[in-house]
Each structure stands twice: as C-alpha cells, then as structure tokens.
C-alpha cells in the first residue's frame, strides 16, 4: 500500500495498546514509518501490572503534541464498593485529567472482563453518577462494549482469538 496517497490527510490511530516502556522506541518508530500524525494510547486493566497509566504518560511526554492517553478506571472499585462504582469512578475522572490523561478507556464491556470483574449493568443506578460526570465534563471515552459474535461460535472463531482466550461459548 502506498501511504503517500493519503499524504494530504492526517492519519490518526485512536486505539493503541502500549504494553511496556521497553517498547517505546519500537512504537514510535512504527508510527513514524506509517506516518501516523497522532495516536491515542489506551490503558486497560493488566493482570501483571498495577497500572499502565504512568508508562503511557511517560510515552506522551516524549511527544506531547502527537500522543493522547486514555486512562483506565481503577477496577478495584468493583470489589470494594460495587454499589457505588459510579461515585468512585466519577471522582477518578478529575484525577486522570490532572495527571495528563485526555480521556477514559473502558474495557469493562468485553466479555472476558465481565467474567473477571463483578461489573454491574451499565444502565444500573450504580453507574449513574459516572455517566452524569462524563456527560457534564464531555471527557471522551473509548468504550469496549462487546466482541464479535463469532467469538461465541467454535466453528467461526479465528485461531488468534482462541489463543488470546476470547472464546466465550460453552
């Protein structure tokens, strides 16, 4: 593919996972090679690390005019205060913005996250304060709300999805 055909248009990648600071140079090299003008690093819960936000903000500091960071919510609220997650998450928004995040990444709608976390229904009263805060503040959200239907069908699911543990059928 000749990317020069798209040269008059800025190329923005709205959804990049940044796994570890050891990948900083590699990620920046890839974005430069692909002529990505700006990109958004999304921070999701990680079973092996407390938070990806500090690493993502460090990456953003390398190129603040090019990189956005969407911080993830502190999922411990699902265990500590399940009936009050909306209040807890609403309070986290100001903290995320103050640290340099530009928005929020929610992966709680992904089926494997819903199996791992006691996430209340998104339209439940527990989430109301959070949605009100997000609406009033106009903070952008990247919200993973499900996975493709073939991830429930053993005959249709791609092998790469099975390898990642994303088969959800019986």
Specify the residue positions occupied by each region the protein language model found.
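Active-site gating/metal-coordination segments in enzymes
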Residues: 4, 53-169
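An N-terminally biased module of ancient metal coordination in phosphate/nucleic-acid-related enzymes
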Residues: 1-65
């Amino acid at each position: 593919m000749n990317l020069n055909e798209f040269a008059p248009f800025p190329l923005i990648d709205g959804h990049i996972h940044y796994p570890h600071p050891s990948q900083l140079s590699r990620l920046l090299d890839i974005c430069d090679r692909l002529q990505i003008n700006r990109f958004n690093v999304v921070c999701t819960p990680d079973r092996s690390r407390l938070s990806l936000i500090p690493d993502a903000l460090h990456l953003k500091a390398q190129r603040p005019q090019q990189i956005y960071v969407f911080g993830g919510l502190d999922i411990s609220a699902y265990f500590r205060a399940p009936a009050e997650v909306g209040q807890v998450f609403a309070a986290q928004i100001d903290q995320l913005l103050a640290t340099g995040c530009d928005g929020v990444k929610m992966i709680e709608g992904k089926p494997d996250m819903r199996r791992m976390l006691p996430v209340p229904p998104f339209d439940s009263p527990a989430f109301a304060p959070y949605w009100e805060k997000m609406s009033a503040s106009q903070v952008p959200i990247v919200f993973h709300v499900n996975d493709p239907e073939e991830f429930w069908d053993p005959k249709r699911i791609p092998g790469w999805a099975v390898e990642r543990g994303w088969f959800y059928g019986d």
